[in-house]
Every structure is written in C-alpha cells, then in structure tokens.
Amino acid sequence: MKALKERILRDGKCFEGGILKVDNFINHQMDPILMKSIAVEFVRRFASTNINKVMTIEASGIAPAIMVGYLLELPVVFAKKKKPVTMENMLTTSVYSFTKDRSYDVCVSKDFLSKGDRVLFIDDFLANGNAAKGIIDLVEKAGAELSGMGFIIEKAFQHGGDYLRNAGIRVESLAIIESLDNCEIKIR
C-alpha cells in the first residue's frame, strides 16, 4: 500500500532492538484518513473470504479493526489484556509483547467468540507473531475458525509472518519492513 509505505518512510522512527515507532499516525495519534484507506485495502484483500466477525487485541489493533468491521458491517471483538470483574464466561491465553517486553493474560467472553464464528484478525504490527499465536489459541478454544489475519505493518526480519504462513494461515500485510539495521527503514 503505497500511501502507508510513504508515511512510514516519512514519519516512522527507528529505535535499537528492531523497534519501529509509528505513534504519530497509527497507534497513539491516528490519521483517520489513512486508517480508512488501510481498512479499504484490507476489505479488498479479504473480499472473497467468508467472515462473520472481526477480532483484534487491545489496544492498537482496535482502530483498524473497527474501520474494517464498519466497512464489512460486521461485529468487532477485541481480546482484553485485563479481565473485567463483570466477565464470567471467558476464554484466556497468555501473550508476550515484544515492544513492552512482558506477558499478558488476554481474555475474550465466550458470548462474543464461539463455535461457528469465522474470524478475521486485524492488528497494527506483526513482529514475532506472539499476539497472533494468542488469538489463534483463543479462536481454537472457542471452536471458531480463523479465516485470515491482516496486519498494517509486518517486520519480516522477526519471522512472525513466516511462522504463520508456514502454519497455513492466510496473512495479508500492507507494509513489510525488511530491515531496520542501522536505524534505516527498508520496506519490501
């Protein structure tokens, strides 16, 4: 996606350890026009896919997932990183965050993810694939089906995409970062 790649090159910032900061247009302050274009592209790429639910994990995946859900006229469910006291009937799994260097127990209500659901997972980043693996676990525990996974940015050098594709999962990434060596952003 050309507009996204140009924006990453113009406004993205690189930090040691393979961190790409895009908080000025994707995951802290958001550019709603760009986010709409991102959602339109995901909808185009998954147009022939049988989906009845869009899913993400809080917090940075919520905006693109809502835009995709809006365009597809489908409900959006996000896995929570903290169990609400009001949630009784839930599925849980553990997810390691590369950026925050810690693990979270994430949960989703069985009322919103269940057998027969055909899920499209949308998130901001794909690095090592840990969040994606957690979502796969939740989907499997629910008896639902994972129809595909869409990521705004994939960091190819961290191989999460390789893992998912080798597992037979359909992965669509709108911008693929080949390298952040010497803090130079190289996009495929």
UniProtKB/Swiss-Prot annotation:
A GO term, aspect molecular function: xanthine phosphoribosyltransferase activity
Metabolic or biological pathway: Purine metabolism; XMP biosynthesis via salvage pathway; XMP from xanthine: step 1/1
UniProt-annotated binding residues for 5-phospho-alpha-D-ribose 1-diphosphate: 127-131
Gene Ontology cellular-component annotations: cytoplasm
Top-rank taxon: Bacteria
Pfam families: Pribosyltran (PF00156)
InterPro entries: PRibTrfase_dom, PRTase-like, Pur/Pyrimidine_PRTase, Xanthine_PRibTrfase
Broad class of enzyme this protein falls into: transferase
Positions with a binding annotation for xanthine: 20, 27, 155
EC number in record: 2.4.2.22
Catalytically driven reaction(s): XMP + diphosphate = xanthine + 5-phospho-alpha-D-ribose 1-diphosphate
Primary localisation category: cytoplasm
Localisation per UniProt entry: Cytoplasm
Keywords: Cytoplasm, Glycosyltransferase, Purine salvage, Transferase
GO biological process: purine ribonucleoside salvage; xanthine metabolic process; XMP salvage
Subunit note: Homodimer.
Function according to Swiss-Prot or TrEMBL: Converts the preformed base xanthine, a product of nucleic acid breakdown, to xanthosine 5'-monophosphate (XMP), so it can be reused for RNA or DNA synthesis.
Family, similarity comment: Belongs to the purine/pyrimidine phosphoribosyltransferase family. Xpt subfamily.
Protein name per UniProt: Xanthine phosphoribosyltransferase
Upper taxonomic lineage: Bacteria, Pseudomonadati, Bacteroidota, Bacteroidia, Bacteroidales
